[in-house]
Amino acid sequence: MKKLVILTCSVAVAVWFSDFVRAQSDAPYTEGPVWDVTMVKTKYGMTDDYLKAIAKTFKGASEEAKKQGLIVDYKILLGTPSSPQDFNILLMTAYKNMAALDNAREKFDPIGRKVEGAPDQQRDAAVKRGDLRDILGDKLMREITLK
């Protein structure tokens, strides 16, 4: 009886493991960090003003989050919009994985207070940035490496 239980458990583990290995090898890529990408359209003539504004907020918060190990990296991309409705700035933040986003407010609210001040100061700064830009959207995307 004991041998039958051991054999049954061994077969079950082997079947589970073979499914796991097969599922891993079927993907044509390996998963990397998760990127939060925000598409920003600055208002006419306001790009430099907006970049100066986020030098404290976005950069300051990102540097602190990176120092604390909450994010892997961050980037700001500046380009020419392809149409009047297109973005010209991408704000990108890389997280190790999706789990790094769990309980985000608990992790990032203290950084916001440290960098921008009390919540009412943060709101005032956000309203002022609204005069400089429009947020066209935000995407959460996974970086992949093709096999």
Whereabouts are the PLM-identified features?
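Immediate post-signal-peptide N-terminus of mature secreted/exported proteins
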Residues: Q24-D49
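Hydrophobic pocket/interface hotspot
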Residues: T38, Y50, L91, L101
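N-terminal, post-signal-peptide region of Sec/Tat-exported proteins
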Residues: K43-L90
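An amphipathic, aromatic/His-enriched active-site/gating alpha helix that lines ligand/cofactor pockets
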Residues: D26-Y29, G60, E64-V72, M92-R142
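Residues that flank catalytic or metal-binding motifs in active/ligand-binding sites
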Residues: V34-D36, F87-I89, D134
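Short, solvent-exposed mixed-charge patches
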Residues: L146-K147
